[in-house]
Amino acid sequence: MKYLMQVRFNGADAVIHELPADEQMRITAEFQAIRKTPGVLDGNQLEAVATAKTVRVNDGETLVSDGPTVADGAELNGYYVYDAPDLDAAIAFASRIPVARMGGTVEVRALMER
């Protein structure tokens, strides 16, 4: 089953840049190792939240607003698509993402298979 991991953390770049250089290097190495994990099909960091646009269509009119759609206040910083044998394996993978232990969250959601 394929799972989407939505990585959310307000101010992630600022928090990481405030860490000592050796800690920044360790976290960077962790992210690189995660990208190389068997089963990772895709993943990337997103550009700054200030570059986001939100698109809605009302009565045939396209409305575009600046900024992200933020339901819970947490910024979407990146994502992974992970092919896991089951939900427990997907959760174990998500727990390895450094943001999960730094005050951010990783939402795990199965992709619909068609």
Residues of each region from the PLM?
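Conserved, structured core segments of small domains
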Residues: 1-114
